[in-house]
């Protein structure tokens, strides 16, 4: 039966295998995406105040899209760079 199937977004799109090509391991990917998602969330929160301290989303977004989904798509598109921190 032919029907319409929703295109998966967020955690399932982009696939984890593609995202792991960008980061060394899945734990680094989680930290990387979470930090960027916090920046995106802070950007949306400060829009009403007129402050522009954080950079907004670098990819096209949808009104109901979560900051983590946006961050994962930015990472997959190669729009962000992460540098390891020496301890």
Swiss-Prot record:
InterPro entries: DNA-dir_RNA_pol_omega (IPR003716), Pol_omega/Rpo6/RPB6 (IPR006110), RPB6/omega-like_sf (IPR036161). Disulfide bonds: none annotated. One of its GO terms (cellular component) is DNA-directed RNA polymerase complex. One of its GO terms (biological process) is DNA-templated transcription. It is an enzyme of class 2 (transferase). Keywords: DNA-directed RNA polymerase, Nucleotidyltransferase, Transcription, Transferase. It comes from the Bacteria. Its EC number is 2.7.7.6. Promotes RNA polymerase assembly. Latches the N- and C-terminal regions of the beta' subunit thereby facilitating its interaction with the beta and alpha subunits. Belongs to the RNA polymerase subunit omega family. This is DNA-directed RNA polymerase subunit omega. It comes from Acidothermus cellulolyticus (strain ATCC 43068 / DSM 8971 / 11B).
